[in-house]
Amino acid sequence: DTKISYPEINSGAKQTEALAAGSLDICSALGGTSAILAASNGVDLKIVGIYSRAPKAFTIMAKDPNITTVSDLTGKKVAGPKGTILHQILVAALAKNNLKPYSVELLSMDIPPSVNAMLNGNVDAALVAGSDVLRAQKAGAHIIISGEGLVDATIVIAARGDLVKNNPDILKRYLSAHRKNIDYMNQEQAKAYDFTAQATGLAPEDVVTMAPWYDFDPEI
């Protein structure tokens, strides 16, 4: 039997640090941008599958009603995690509006504190993804733009190169279990939504709202 532990690490940078240190074997949901940055910095990781593609789930948000377009962000403070899909969306959105990355002041912080900083008025906008989008909307913030049409927003499944090379059977078993999970989600949608709500603490209606944002096809 194989003993499995499942640490909850939400930061892409911390996931790849754990891979590099050998304390983590598989990242079940790693931002594609984080994977590329880690590999370019010498981390021995291999992309073995796709967790999701979800451009609608990654957004730039503001609470100030006067900030409604990307151009309105010029000279403003934006909070969010650097070196991530969200950062990539910000740069792409600015470029699409003929603006440079330095047109805004990006303050690097994780998503929940970024949302809090925006809601408290400490920054003008925030890079927000997943359930935090709904949290921010319920607190009066609005979406300026999502990643749709800008990036694929691909979340990958990545593994340590050593695991791929020396323990391929373990990886095959993991990917088989992942595919079975996807099949269950598709076949038993109501049960899958209920389980997700219980596991995450999200309201059932929020799970239903967010589900269409994600494409969980695991094929690369």
Q: Where do the protein language model's features map onto the residues?
A:
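A bilobed periplasmic-binding-protein/Venus flytrap-type ligand-binding module shared by bacterial periplasmic
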Residues: 58-67, 154-169
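Secondary-structure end/capping motifs
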Residues: 166-220
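Aromatic-anchored, glycine/proline-accented short structural segments
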Residues: 140-144, 157-159
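Short, glycine-/small- and polar/acidic-enriched structural segments
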Residues: 1-100, 105-110, 124-130, 142-151
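Stable alpha-helical elements in mature extracytoplasmic
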Residues: 15, 34, 69, 86, ...
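Short helix- or helix-capping micro-motifs
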Residues: 136
